[in-house]
Regions:
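Conserved acetyl-CoA-binding loop-helix of GNAT-fold acetyltransferases
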Residues: 98-114
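Conserved GNAT-family N-acetyltransferase fold
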Residues: 56-58, 94
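Conserved beta-strand-loop-alpha-helix junction that forms the acyl-donor binding cleft
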Residues: 96, 122-133, 148
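Conserved acyl-donor/pantetheine-binding loop and adjacent beta-alpha core of acyl/acetyltransferases
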Residues: 59-90
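A short, internal acetyl-CoA/4′-phosphopantetheine-binding micro-motif in the GNAT/acyltransferase core
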Residues: 89-101
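Conserved catalytic-core motifs of GNAT/GCN5-like acyltransferases
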Residues: 136, 141-154
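Short amphipathic alpha-helix that is part of the acyltransferase structural core
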Residues: 1-40, 45-50, 54
Length: 156
């Protein structure tokens, strides 16, 4: 049991930080989205930092509605950027480099959302068993299936 506890001990020494640059080709979900897309119209990239290394990455957008495609995400985040009316964070890609980082970065994103006054975090997830299990295990509720994506909701 002690080995398991020691294995995840590093998670207590992490920091949720905004990133200005990442290697987009590392993204296992949406590698086709370039850095400009990920950082324009109030879209942001966050990392889970431990000992000067980024162990988890999450790309988010701010919207008022729930997108079902990347195109809708783009349009909705542009509208919210200009209208300044977003109330939801859309996590459209999450990945980790170290065991436990995926869960921890979602926990940190929920804290961030709460401190910034957002109502919820909604995902724009691929239709894969891995994505489904990740979100259900972390406490999200399935909002719906779309032709190419699925949405899960985390209450803040």
């Amino acid at each position: 049991m002690k080995k398991v506890i020691d294995w995840f001990k590093w998670l207590g020494k992490t920091e949720f930080v905004e990133l200005k640059d990442i290697d987009c080709s590392e993204d296992p979900v949406r590698p086709e989205l370039d850095l400009k897309f990920r950082t324009s119209y109030d879209r942001k990239i966050f990392g889970l930092k431990h000992d000067d290394k980024i162990e988890g990455i999450m790309c988010i957008a701010f919207t008022k509605d729930v997108p079902h495609t990347v195109r809708e995400l783009d349009l909705m985040s542009r509208i919210s950027h200009y209208e300044k009316d977003s109330d939801s964070i859309i996590a459209y890609t999450v990945w980790s480099r170290k065991r436990g980082a995926g869960k921890k970065i979602m926990e940190e994103a929920l804290k961030f959302a709460k401190t910034k006054g957002f109502k919820r975090i909604v995902t724009l997830s691929p239709l894969t068993p891995m994505a489904t299990h990740y979100h259900i295990r972390n406490g999200a509720k399935l909002l719906g299936h779309n032709p190419t994506t699925q949405n899960f909701e985390y209450k803040v």
